[in-house]
């Protein structure tokens, strides 16, 4: 294949095709002019012009990205994976295959869908591993009376959903906490997972983290393999599961999160300790009351980095 054919093939199959077409014509015409006289010059001219062409297109990502705080962008569903009896992992394709989403820890996205002519907005936290390229991943649990979650459950590949963000208030400073206690319930694990992925692998951040993760049944535990892998790989992270309706083989904690479990598994209230809570409203309210009894000051939602307790 000639250098010209290679350029045409490469550009026509990459995300900048519409942008590059005009510049490619100039790249093609020039080497054809020199083909019979200076074969070496053909390659030099082609490569130089192609580098300029592609670099210019690469810079254009900054002005045409997949997420904005102040406007909606539609992205297509590219993959859907069932991860539990009522929960799926949804993968949406970004505009560019090597685009990375820079979503601050603990932040979420606004998601908009149209159902029966009505636009509905919900908020979800991406579960992308840091530096993931080309796609956005969401974990969505389908609820019996959840209009939007049931809409997600019926999504087809290449169907579009609108996104806006990132949005949020949590600000984490690794210098403010030596120990971090986290209580998550159900799908509330998704923003927590984002926090864990940011802190735990960092060699500069050795904050000790203890997580209590509560669910209705063992089958409802989301991302369990990931959590167990983190706990095995990083000794400064511990995870404890609580199941409301266990099966016969379950040998962990049973029921709802209790005051005693918080005392047993989570760090005590201290100046350099923090507590994060993310779950259903009733669970959050109950856990906040327990936190009061344990000496934590609560009711914080600002997330300015000095709050002792933060509720997602």
Curated annotation (Swiss-Prot):
Membrane-spanning ranges: 15-35, 42-62, 180-200
Chief subcellular location: membrane
Cofactor(s) the record lists: FAD
Stretch forming the signal peptide: none
EC number: 1.-.-.-
Residue ranges, Cytoplasmic side: 36-41, 201-312
Family: Belongs to the flavoprotein pyridine nucleotide cytochrome reductase family.
Name of the protein described by the UniProt record: Uncharacterized oxidoreductase AIM33
Organism, scientific name: Saccharomyces cerevisiae (strain ATCC 204508 / S288c) (Baker's yeast)
The gene coding this protein: AIM33
